Curated annotation (Swiss-Prot):
Transport keyword on record: no
Feature type site, description Key residue for inhibition of muscle alpha-1-beta-1-delta-epsilon (CHRNA1-CHRNB1-CHRND-CHRNE) and important for inhibition of neuronal alpha-3-beta-2/CHRNA3-CHRNB2 nAChR: M46
Function: This three-finger toxin binds and inhibits the nicotinic acetylcholine receptor (nAChR).
Protein's UniProt name: Short neurotoxin SNTX11
S-S bonds: C24-C40, C33-C58, C62-C70, C71-C76
Residues carrying the site annotation Important residue for inhibition of muscle alpha-1-beta-1-delta-epsilon (CHRNA1-CHRNB1-CHRND-CHRNE) and neuronal alpha-3-beta-2/CHRNA3-CHRNB2 nAChR: H28, K43, H51, K66
Alphabetical keyword list: Acetylcholine receptor inhibiting toxin, Disulfide bond, Ion channel impairing toxin, Neurotoxin, Postsynaptic neurotoxin, Secreted, Signal, Toxin
Free-text tissue specificity from the UniProt record: Expressed by the venom gland.
Site feature (Key residue for inhibition of muscle alpha-1-beta-1-delta-epsilon (CHRNA1-CHRNB1-CHRND-CHRNE) and important residue for inhibition of neuronal alpha-3-beta-2/CHRNA3-CHRNB2 nAChR) residues: F48
Major localization listed first in the record, in broad terms: secreted
Domain of life: Eukaryota
Lineage, opening ranks: Eukaryota, Metazoa, Chordata, Craniata, Vertebrata
Length: 78
């Protein structure tokens, strides 16, 4: 009986972990990422000279541009 309960506990823990989704900051608020999006990012880009634009959110892969940050824990891209 104890073995059955232990097995049930392990299966429950594994199943709960499979449903985890990452939460990232956006410029305004939070974003719940899609299951395949494993990273949060923050990057600053210049669309016009002397006018930096901040981009934040979920991503499938880390950006490689200069002035970018990539991380993989909840709300890590503030």
């Amino acid at each position: 009986m104890k073995t059955l309960l232990l097995t049930f506990l392990v299966v429950t823990i594994v199943c709960l972990d499979l449903g985890y989704t990452l939460i990232c900051h956006r410029v305004h608020g939070l974003q719940t990422c899609e299951p395949d999006q494993k990273f949060c990012f923050r990057k600053t880009t210049m669309f016009f000279p002397n006018h930096p634009v901040l981009l934040m959110g979920c991503t499938y892969s880390c950006p490689t541009e200069k002035y970018s940050v990539c991380c993989s824990t909840d709300k890590c891209n503030k």
